[in-house]
Amino acid sequence: MKKFILALLATAAMAMAESHTHDGFFLNLALGFGYQGFTYDANKAIYDMEAKGVSTEFDLKLGGCIATNTLLHATILGVTNNSEIDYKTKGGKKLGSSSEESENLSMLGIGLTYYLPENIFISGSVGFAQFNLQDNSDEDKDIEGATEKGLGVQIAAGKEWWVSDNWGLGLSVAFTYGAAEDKDDLGDASAYGVNVMFSATFN
């Protein structure tokens, strides 16, 4: 993955970008909010977990043009579920809930973004996903536990508006999915989410 990213950046650095065109170097920063549904099915763990509610997402895409209006990029994203975590028995009986912990999904992968006329775009990324639980009870917000790396996917579609020769501001809808096994076969985590994203793109 590191060699791929370095090669990608080297290719992008050599490409000269013209104004109001999708060529050369590509940088996309996006922040948004929406909904995520998270489930943890226990195997050796004592209880199941579930969190469904408001989420926030941050994305970074970095790469370059490989064909007309087509960008190849590395994708880094993080989704935080801001709702309470419910703890349940394996039979589904609720044991309690807590707001002192929050679930996070992170992904590192590769993707393609394609621009249609009128600056409408579609984007897809696939990579390694990982879940962790964050302790919100103190200022340090320590990570309490993390799963193994699993599968992550993001699909997005939206529109951008040029605000300078090479910068554009955008609005999109992003769907994310992640699934991973916990360490030592304690359980299986999965999550899906839909977020409205606001972005700034240099291209």
Q: Could you say what each language-model-derived stretch is?
A:
Residues M49-E50, L72-G111, N132-Q134:
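Surface-exposed loop and membrane-interface regions of Gram-negative outer-membrane beta-barrel proteins
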Residues M1-D23:
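Cleavable N-terminal export/targeting peptides
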Residues L27-L31, A74, I110-L112, I122-V126, ...:
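Membrane-embedded beta-strand positions of outer-membrane beta-barrel proteins
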Residues A17-D86, A191-N203:
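Short glycine/proline- and aromatic-enriched beta-strand/turn motifs that initiate or cap beta-hairpins
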Residues T56, G78, S106, F128-N132, ...:
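Transmembrane beta-barrel architecture of outer-membrane proteins
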